[in-house]
Amino acid sequence: MEKETILQHVREQANKWLNSNIDEATRKEILYLLEHDEKELIESFYRVLEFGTGGLRGIMGAGTNRMNIYTIGMATQGLCNYLLKAFHGLEEISVAIAHDCRNNSRLFAETTARICTANGIKAYLFDELRPTPELSFAIRELNCQSGVVITASHNPREYNGYKVYWEDGGQIIHPHDTNIINEVKSIQSIDEIKFDGNKNMIQSLGEEMDEKYLEKVKELSLNPDQIRKHADLKI
């Protein structure tokens, strides 16, 4: 694809976002890219950040190829659409949500919870950062149908990620991964995302879940006596 063709494409995508219902900070960032930073504009809009078998992962910023509340929103809306189909007839569908300490992780987790509840899906949201294994435990403990953790694992600090888990506490596998990917791809516009959440459908998770998780971890210890014996081991 020639540079002029690429530029035309990314400008069209950027203007499509500007004509959508986006926040003022994102709008200003896009306008700056259009006027002052052609290279970053191309990087931000030349493609759509791909939702793969593990979810999303990318650099944070404005644009279709960046991690932001709108790409997170499209992923969550697609997930919700699939959950409503997969568990049609279930009285209550619920999702557990956790996050790490990266920039914007709390914002992305709260955005995920809002969109879930806007779709009539209950959200269990940890009150602050938690390890991914505790998210998997919470899914099973609360009988959730799915879970999301906001993390980019080992990637540099400018990255963030969005990983989806199923009702067994494990990451999504076939056929659910393919079906969710297809639902996410079907979201063509920011305006299709339901952001208007219901606070009454968001339940905070805290110390009580921590205690249950730690008790279960202790139960799985292969040799508790040895652990107690060497509890003063320095690392």
Language model regions located:
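Phosphate/oxyanion-binding active-site loops and adjacent basic polyanion-contact surfaces
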Residues: 67-77, 104-105, 127, 131, ...
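Ferredoxin-reductase
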Residues: 6, 17-18, 90-167
